[in-house]
């Protein structure tokens, strides 16, 4: 029996070629930098060019207009983004919209926002509001969208992901081990 291949999503906030080169071509990179209020457009364009040459997909967090303007592979809408104004824009055919949620209310908001996949966090104990496997299964069963596990995933606990009905997993620490 073969294991199903899970999509991998890596959250980055800097352009570090050493870390990027350690990842395989199936890893999708999501750039998010919540420390600054303004995106560094030069950094985003350099990342886009570098990742495109490598064959990786590149998404931008929480900035729909800029993702369209720079013709990125898509956008990631964090759980705190409850806006629907992006629905007024037309996108190209392979543009991906992803979103994250922590509870049922946020899942319904993300479905209304038109996301293709919902990142549900936090699966493993990394903070006080982690879900655990049973709550994660229960919450994810309320959506027909593709579900991506997020939070506390490491190389040690990836075997547990096979117990879940998910299309992929996302994180930071897993990719930096």
Region locations from a protein language model:
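Boundary/entry segment of secreted carbohydrate-active catalytic domains
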Residues: 1-16, 176
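Hydrophobic faces of well-ordered beta-strands that scaffold small-molecule active sites
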Residues: 6-12, 27-31, 58-60, 75-77, ...
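Short, acidic/polar
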Residues: 11-23, 62-65, 102-109, 154-160
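Acidic (Asp/Glu)-rich catalytic clusters
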Residues: 19-25, 50-53, 89-92, 111-112, ...
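N-terminal active-site wall of soluble small-molecule enzyme domains
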Residues: 26-90
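Glycine-rich phosphate-binding active-site loops on the catalytic face of alpha/beta enzymes
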Residues: 34, 75-87, 117-132, 153-177
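Alpha-helix-loop-beta-strand connector modules within alpha/beta enzyme cores
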Residues: 43-59, 82, 86-103, 131-154
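Glycine/Thr-rich beta-alpha phosphate-binding loop at enzyme active sites
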Residues: 69-81, 95-141
């Amino acid at each position: 029996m073969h294991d199903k291949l899970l999509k991998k999503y890596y959250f980055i906030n800097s352009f570090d070629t050493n870390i990027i080169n350690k990842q395989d071509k199936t890893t999708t990179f999501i750039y998010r930098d919540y420390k600054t209020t303004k995106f560094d457009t030069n950094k985003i364009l350099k990342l886009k060019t570098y990742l495109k040459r490598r064959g990786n997909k590149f998404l931008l967090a929480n900035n729909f207009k800029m993702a369209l303007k720079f013709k990125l592979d898509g956008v990631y809408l964090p759980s705190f983004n409850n806006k629907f104004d992006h629905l007024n824009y037309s996108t190209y055919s392979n543009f991906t919209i992803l979103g994250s949620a922590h509870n049922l209310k946020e899942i319904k908001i993300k479905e209304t926002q038109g996301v293709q996949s919902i990142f549900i966090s936090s699966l493993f104990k990394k903070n006080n509001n982690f879900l655990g496997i049973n709550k994660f299964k229960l919450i994810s069963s309320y959506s027909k969208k593709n579900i991506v596990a997020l939070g506390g995933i490491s190389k040690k606990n990836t075997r547990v992901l096979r117990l879940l009905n998910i299309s992929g997993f996302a994180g930071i620490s897993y990719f930096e081990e």
